[in-house]
């Protein structure tokens, strides 16, 4: 680890991790690479949570983000009604590969202060329609990560399936939470991302997926050229797939890629 990342805690003892990754927390095997998918939380697996916090901080810091703390763990990870952690674990490597944190929103809606439980409520205003008609059937997703050693640029063989493995886990959530109809969350784009590429990406999303009902609105809207007339003219009238190809080329020409959660 470089000196710039030396503030991050060392790896958690593997014996402690294995002791907490018990069969009752195993959800399924992945379709590729035969990895394991677990659901854990701070209360039933504190050592696994600590390793997740270490890997999140390492991953985000190496991408230009990070909290600057020894672990990326906040009060929503440790609260009484805490976020659960969906993780992919490689038995072959004895490593946690990737993860999401998630909260079944129906768990907190009976609390008058339910918005304090939701990470996204810090960033967005929710309409009554969204709260009443969507949240009871929604899982909030956040903190999506793939540790650096399993990203395609570092490990082409295993990295190609890292996100695919994690999405196997999302499929499992649909099975285990039968009332859920929606996944919801935010995508982080760091300030280092090329602004022209960012503006094109946001214009693309607004063009094909407008929030005409005002379900969710940002508390601090990003100031950017929403009209982005030149790019909109390029995609206007195109089918989604063709417009996406154009977007991908536009972004690549600026030495960026479309974020995996949008790809």
Annotate each predicted stretch with a short phrase.
Residues 29-74, 85-101:
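Short amphipathic alpha-helix that is part of the acyltransferase structural core
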Residues 102-106:
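Acetyl-CoA-dependent GNAT
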Residues 77-87, 110, 263:
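A short helix-loop-beta-strand connector motif used in the catalytic cores of GNAT acetyltransferases and
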Residues 69-82, 191-193:
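Beta-rich nucleic-acid/ligand-interaction surfaces
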């Amino acid at each position: 680890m470089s000196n710039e990342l030396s503030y991050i805690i060392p790896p958690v003892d593997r014996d402690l991790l294995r002791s907490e990754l018990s069969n009752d927390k195993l959800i399924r095997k992945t379709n590729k690479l035969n990895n394991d998918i677990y659901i854990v939380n701070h209360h039933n697996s504190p050592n696994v949570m600590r390793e997740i916090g270490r890997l999140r901080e390492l991953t985000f810091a190496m991408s230009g983000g990070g909290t600057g703390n020894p672990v990326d763990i906040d009060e929503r990870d440790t609260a009484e009604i805490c976020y659960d952690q969906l993780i992919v674990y490689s038995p072959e490597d004895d490593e946690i590969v990737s993860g999401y944190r998630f909260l079944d929103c129906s768990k907190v809606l009976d609390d008058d202060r339910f918005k304090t439980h939701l990470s996204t409520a810090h960033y967005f205003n929710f309409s009554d329609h969204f709260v009443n008609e969507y949240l009871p059937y929604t899982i909030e997703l956040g903190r999506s990560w793939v540790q650096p050693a399993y990203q395609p640029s570092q490990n082409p063989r295993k990295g190609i399936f890292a996100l695919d493995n994690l999405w196997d886990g999302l499929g499992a959530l649909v099975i285990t939470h039968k009332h859920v109809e929606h996944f919801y969350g935010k995508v982080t784009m760091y300030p280092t991302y090329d602004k022209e590429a960012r503006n094109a990406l946001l214009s693309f999303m607004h063009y094909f997926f407008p929030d005409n009902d005002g379900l969710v609105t940002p508390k601090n809207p990003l100031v950017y050229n929403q009209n982005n007339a030149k790019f909109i003219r390029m995609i206007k009238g195109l089918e989604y797939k063709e417009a996406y190809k154009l977007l991908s080329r536009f972004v690549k020409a600026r030495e960026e890629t479309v974020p995996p959660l949008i790809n």
